Amino acid sequence: MSAFPGLPRVLAGGIILVDPGSGAVQRTIAFQYNPDTMTRTLKTESIGPESGDRLEATRLKGAPVETIKLDAELDATDQLEYPDQNPEVVQYGLHPQLAMLEMITYPSSTSVQDNIDLAAIGTIEIIPMEAPLALFAWGATRIVPVRVTDLSITEEAFDPRLNPIRAKVGLTMQVLNVNDLGVGTWGTSLFMAYHQRKEQLAGLGPATPLAALGITRIL
């Protein structure tokens, strides 16, 4: 799984966990090997026919609901070739890397314990626990707030201690837009930058004349 010498260095994609209020970086999780493919699905947020107004047919309620799916591979083979330089890999295999990804879907144990303590003293309303805001980073033009909606882990090989040493991780993420994050938040500012970059990139696309479609006019 080592890179061939002489090849240009490829940027790593990954997930950045930040404080949702200030944007301060709490943790960066880079993919060991970038996925070969990534599937993005956009579901339009239109007004819909239920409004009864035909003029609403071309109106949008907001940005589409964008879902990103990818599979990432983890492999400890290279590190295990140099055990003295990678003692944690020898002892735990891929457990630390997998745990970092899994913790995106967990609240902190401290928050859980605080709610348990509040429930024990009869607190009626317990506030849902706030997690760090996850950002999906895939190059300079795609840094976007997301919610990890599904995480699947397939452990494919193990060492003698049954630590996983090769695994495949399936990630499904929903892009969080203005409707999800609210007006005036740090995450909304980041999404708007993502939205505006899309507009800029769309403006760089080639202008195609009607003749290319075999027509001279629409009506």
Give names to the regions the model predicted.
Residues 1-219:
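Acidic, Ser/Thr- and Gly-enriched intrinsically disordered low-complexity segments
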